[in-house]
């Protein structure tokens, strides 16, 4: 069945690339951020897809570098009164939903996500209304308003387990917004899943022909793939998983060379995990084609040192995340279900 909104035809204006900083400027902003974090009783929570220098700063200041599920856990449990979320807007909203008593700052509130943009709440509500017999499961990469409509929120790290659980209960599913991840989960579980047709602009660009050529060039390499990638790319993988699961796979696979099909921001932590292995970027452009994202989310790239310093220094409407209380309470229900379910998996 077609949906009311077609993300494939939507045009997402990319933000301008941040102005490069000199070595001296980087050193200046790094020290300024460290000082401001202490003064504000703040901690950094950074996603794997942010730039390496941002992840390094989060490490050095006692913050967190992780996938969206662990970011949510860390921020809710940390005693800091202020969370600086280096990521995209839905991550800041999720932090505010889980920690309403804390000040949530972002380097920019214009850091979007194509999956979030590709699932407008009005169209999604109409889609759900047309299928009232289905349990609504939405990916973490959605707005607070879409989460508020859901029965469950899920991340890629526990998606298969959750849908397998719901399928065992005989529940039919609406899955949104990522069509590739939805199809992967459906294939793994056999569940009755009706997918919204969104896609990540980064993972959607991986090309099978170019990947095949790279594989022929490096026949001893293992291929690691995020399930937001097209099915044909997933079918070529030696390991499929979330960001944290791909890092774990890099450690356990015997191969000394790894081709990685996800945002290249992950290379910072993956290379730390396997310093003796060679990491190669999976190609994003096919024969005669060009890439838009080129394996790095343009909105993640907005989380620069200068923007982080400005967020900590200025606060205010340009940097602080707010979620209306009634909306927050509704979105909290499926988020807590996710966290509780994830806790049962961890034992």
Swiss-Prot record:
GO cellular component: cytosol
Biological-process GO terms, alphabetical: 'de novo' NAD biosynthetic process from L-aspartate
Enzyme Commission number: 2.5.1.72
Residues annotated as binding iminosuccinate: 47, 68, 139-141, 156, 226-228, 243
UniProt key word Secreted: no
Keywords: 4Fe-4S, Cytoplasm, Iron, Iron-sulfur, Metal-binding, Pyridine nucleotide biosynthesis, Transferase
Cofactor(s) demanded: [4Fe-4S] cluster
InterPro entries to which the protein is assigned, alphabetical: NadA, NadA_sf, Quinolinate_synth_A_type1
Primary location: cytoplasm
Cofactor info, note text: Binds 1 [4Fe-4S] cluster per subunit.
Enzyme class: transferase
UniProt-annotated location(s): Cytoplasm
Residue numbers binding [4Fe-4S] cluster: 113, 200, 297
UniProt GO molecular function: 4 iron, 4 sulfur cluster binding; metal ion binding; quinolinate synthetase A activity
Pathway: Cofactor biosynthesis; NAD(+) biosynthesis; quinolinate from iminoaspartate: step 1/1
Known catalytic reactions: iminosuccinate + dihydroxyacetone phosphate = quinolinate + phosphate + 2 H2O + H(+)
Stated family: Belongs to the quinolinate synthase family. Type 1 subfamily.
Known function: Catalyzes the condensation of iminoaspartate with dihydroxyacetone phosphate to form quinolinate.
HAMAP family in the record: NadA_type1
Protein name stated in the entry: Quinolinate synthase
UniProt source species: Escherichia coli O9:H4 (strain HS)
């Amino acid at each position: 069945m077609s949906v009311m909104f077609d993300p494939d035809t939507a045009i997402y204006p990319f933000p301008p690339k941040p102005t490069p900083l000199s070595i001296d400027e980087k050193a200046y902003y790094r020290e300024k951020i460290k000082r401001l974090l202490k003064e504000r009783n703040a901690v950094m929570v950074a996603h794997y897809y942010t730039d390496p220098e941002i992840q390094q700063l989060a490490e050095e200041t006692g913050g967190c570098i992780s996938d969206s599920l662990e970011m949510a856990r860390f921020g809710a449990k940390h005693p800091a009164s202020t969370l600086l979320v280096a990521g995209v807007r839905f991550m800041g909203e999720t932090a505010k939903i889980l920690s309403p008593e804390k000040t949530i700052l972002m380097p920019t509130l214009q850091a979007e996500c194509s999956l979030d943009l590709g699932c407008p709440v009005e169209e999604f509500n109409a889609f759900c209304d047309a299928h009232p017999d289905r349990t609504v499961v939405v990916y973490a990469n959605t707005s607070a308003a879409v989460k508020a409509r859901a029965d469950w929120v899920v991340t890629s790290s526990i998606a298969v387990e959750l849908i397998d659980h719901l399928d065992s209960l005989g529940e039919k599913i609406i899955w949104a917004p990522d069509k590739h991840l939805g199809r992967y989960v459906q294939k793994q579980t056999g569940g009755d899943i009706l997918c919204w047709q969104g896609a990540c602009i980064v993972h959607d660009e991986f090309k099978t022909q170019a990947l095949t050529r790279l594989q022929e060039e490096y026949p001893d390499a293992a291929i690691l793939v995020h399930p937001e990638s097209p099915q044909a790319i997933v079918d070529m993988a030696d390991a499929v998983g979330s960001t944290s699961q791909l890092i774990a796979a890099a450690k356990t696979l015997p191969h000394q060379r790894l081709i990685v099909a996800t945002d290249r921001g992950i290379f910072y932590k993956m290379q730390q995990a396997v310093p003796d292995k060679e990491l190669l970027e999976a190609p994003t452009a096919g024969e005669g084609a060009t890439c838009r994202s080129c394996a790095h989310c343009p909105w993640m790239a907005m989380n620069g040192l200068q923007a982080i310093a400005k967020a900590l220094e200025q606060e205010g409407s340009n940097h602080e995340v707010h979620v209306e209380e009634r909306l927050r309470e509704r979105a909290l229900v499926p988020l807590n279900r996710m966290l509780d379910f994830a806790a049962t998996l961890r034992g």
